[in-house]
Amino acid sequence: MGGTASTRRVTFEADENENITVVKGIRLSENVIDRMKETSPSGPKSQRYSGTYGASVSDEELKRRVAEELALEQAKKESENQKRLKQSKELDAEKAFANEQLTRAILRERISNEEERAKAKHLAKQLEEKDRVIKKQDAFYKEQLARLEERSSEFYKVTTEQYQKAAEEVEAKFKRYEYHPVCADLQAQILQCYRQNTQQTLSCSALASQYMRCVNQAKQSTLEKGG
């Protein structure tokens, strides 16, 4: 009796999900049950639920088959897990690559914007420098013009004083003679010009030159007659 393996009839029962069968307290999937029935020497394959599995199956044989099927199921799950892990790694790699490309694009855009800002800043600095130079030149020209106007005014003043002095000398020397102002027309024109151009006396320089020539000629003529 000890050398004979014990046998018993095994019953398959479907649970509420209709795709899981309980074998001696072990929950097996429908795929596992189908494969066990395919290798079983008993009964048609269509017998699935609420039936008897085989005529007699020993505990050792049942355990072996269940262990094999469970090992296959575990290997299948591990294979699927490996596939999912591989897909997850590939997806992570693609995401990392996309993020790297996006980061590079953002950096290039920032560099481009910084270069544009640097160019604009440099151009603004150049314009400021040009404006400073122009203002400096304008101030220089205004200063030179003011000096010329001042010199012209002084020249006219000195010339007028010299003329008055010469006229007084001539008048004192020739009191008996009646005389008329020399170059009176030009003198009147010059006086009117300076009144009208108090801020731009340089514009009267042409009249002043004519007046000086006229005065010198009159003076020379008077001296020659007196000599």
From Swiss-Prot:
Membrane-related topology note: Lipid-anchor
Lineage, broadest ranks: Eukaryota, Metazoa, Chordata, Craniata, Vertebrata
Motif (Cx9C motif 2): 204-214
Disulfide-linked positions: C183-C214, C193-C204
Protein name: MICOS complex subunit MIC19
Entry keyword Manganese: no
GO biological process terms on file: inner mitochondrial membrane organization
One example GO MF annotation: molecular adaptor activity
